[in-house]
């Protein structure tokens, strides 16, 4: 089911939560809403669900005006961060709850629960209670319960926010695979930019109640529309173009390191090193002044991402290896000018 948000605004007292927002979500897509706290993303999600009323504007579901439609008429499944499972019901009964309320055929209920347990890979835990499950397992049950009634739209509000980092990574992959098997139109709110980049087909970036940019993960990361998006969606390094008297940004993976200076290279000293399974992160202090702005602090610290292979190659070429205090020369492979900003 498609979703069309048309000129939606919402105010709480004197706080403008949403300011004339327009957004189209295509049927079957997987969309992430990201932005700082208070930017309006959760408010919009609740409006789509029918939990909040707009001050102005319209919400269209599958081409029909649903602005004032009651929750039960919207055919929407909603999953919150805190699971909201019934503690006194086992896994199977939690999943079947919505179907039983609708007085579905008992055979259909059993079949649907069986299919969903298989889908979330918890067939062996059908008789367990929520207290006997891990956080990740409880969240999968919550998703299955939302899917049991075959919603046209699935809304997820910080679905993995209460889980530890390892479980979140596992569930990101699981959610992506789940959506491929059951391509229900899905909109989820997250504070984790990396989660949005890994899971979503399309990302919507909010800031102060307005949309800053809508696009694919690649578009958002490589071609940010505004300085805010640039700084919010991943780490950025800043440089100054003395010829054009403007500022530019470089992503950490678009920096080349060298052992000797070359044209347009910048010298710097390694002040931090972070080891990863497949990559290395270097923090290099470059003696240049970058003007401060509302989207980035003043500073000269560049972060550089290298594959372990490239790092090992450079490490073998430098006497004593790359270590804290080593002097390197860096050069941007690709830069983006900061639109609307100059020094």
Swiss-Prot record:
Function, in words: Part of the ABC transporter complex involved in sulfate/thiosulfate import. Responsible for energy coupling to the transport system.
Domain ABC transporter positions: 3-233
Organism expressing this protein natively: Nephroselmis olivacea (Green alga)
EC main group: translocase
Keyword hit for Coiled coil: no
Protein's name according to its UniProt entry: Sulfate/thiosulfate import ATP-binding protein CysA
UniProt xrefs under PROSITE patterns: ABC_TRANSPORTER_1, ABC_TRANSPORTER_2, CYSA
Protein EC: 7.3.2.3
CDD domains: ABC_CysA_sulfate_importer
Annotated ATP binding sites: 35-42
Organism phylogeny: Eukaryota, Viridiplantae, Chlorophyta, Nephroselmidophyceae, Nephroselmidales
Entry's localization field: Plastid, Chloroplast
InterPro entries cross-referenced by the UniProt entry: AAA+_ATPase, ABC_SmlMolc_Importer, ABC_transporter-like_ATP-bd, ABC_transporter-like_CS, P-loop_NTPase, Sulph_transpt1
NCBIfam families linked to this entry: 3a0106s01
GO cellular component, one term: chloroplast
A UniProt-annotated Pfam family: ABC_tran
Family: Belongs to the ABC transporter superfamily. Sulfate/tungstate importer (TC 3.A.1.6) family.
GO MF annotation, one: ATP hydrolysis activity
Reactions this protein catalyses: sulfate(out) + ATP + H2O = sulfate(in) + ADP + phosphate + H(+); thiosulfate(out) + ATP + H2O = thiosulfate(in) + ADP + phosphate + H(+)
Keywords on record: ATP-binding, Chloroplast, Nucleotide-binding, Plastid, Sulfate transport, Translocase, Transport
């Amino acid at each position: 089911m498609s979703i069309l948000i048309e000129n939606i605004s919402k105010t709480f007292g004197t706080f403008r939560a949403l300011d004339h927002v327009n957004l189209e979500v295509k049927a079957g897509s997987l969309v992430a809403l990201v932005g700082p706290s208070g930017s309006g993303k959760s408010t919009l999600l609740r409006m789509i669900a029918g939990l909040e009323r707009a001050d102005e504007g319209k919400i269209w579901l599958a081409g029909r005006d649903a602005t004032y439609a009651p929750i039960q008429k919207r055919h929407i499944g909603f999953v919150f961060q805190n699971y909201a499972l019934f503690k006194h019901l086992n896994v199977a009964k939690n999943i079947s709850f919505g179907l039983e309320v609708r007085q579905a055929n008992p055979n259909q209920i059993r079949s649907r629960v069986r299919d969903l347990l298989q889908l979330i890979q918890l067939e062996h835990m059908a008789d367990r209670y929520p207290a006997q499950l891990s956080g990740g397992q409880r969240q999968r049950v919550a998703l299955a319960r939302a899917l049991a009634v075959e919603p046209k739209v699935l809304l997820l509000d910080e679905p993995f926010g209460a889980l530890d980092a390892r479980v979140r990574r596992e569930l990101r992959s699981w959610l992506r695979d789940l959506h491929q098997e059951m391509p229900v139109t899905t909109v989820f709110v997250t504070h984790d930019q990396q989660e949005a980049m890994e899971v979503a087909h399309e990302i919507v970036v909010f800031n102060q109640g307005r949309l800053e940019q809508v696009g694919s993960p690649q578009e958002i990361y490589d071609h940010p529309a505004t300085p805010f998006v640039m700084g919010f969606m991943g780490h950025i390094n800043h440089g100054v173009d003395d010829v054009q008297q403007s500022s530019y940004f470089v992503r950490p993976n678009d920096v080349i390191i060298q052992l000797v200076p070359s044209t347009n290279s910048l010298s710097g000293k390694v002040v931090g090193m972070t080891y990863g399974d497949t990559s290395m992160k270097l923090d290099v202090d470059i003696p240049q002044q970058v003007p401060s702005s509302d989207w980035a602090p003043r500073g000269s610290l560049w972060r550089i991402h290298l594959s372990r292979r490239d790092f090992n190659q450079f490490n073998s070429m430098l006497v004593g290896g790359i270590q804290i205090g080593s002097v390197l020369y860096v050069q941007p492979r690709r830069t983006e000018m900061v639109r609307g900003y100059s020094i």
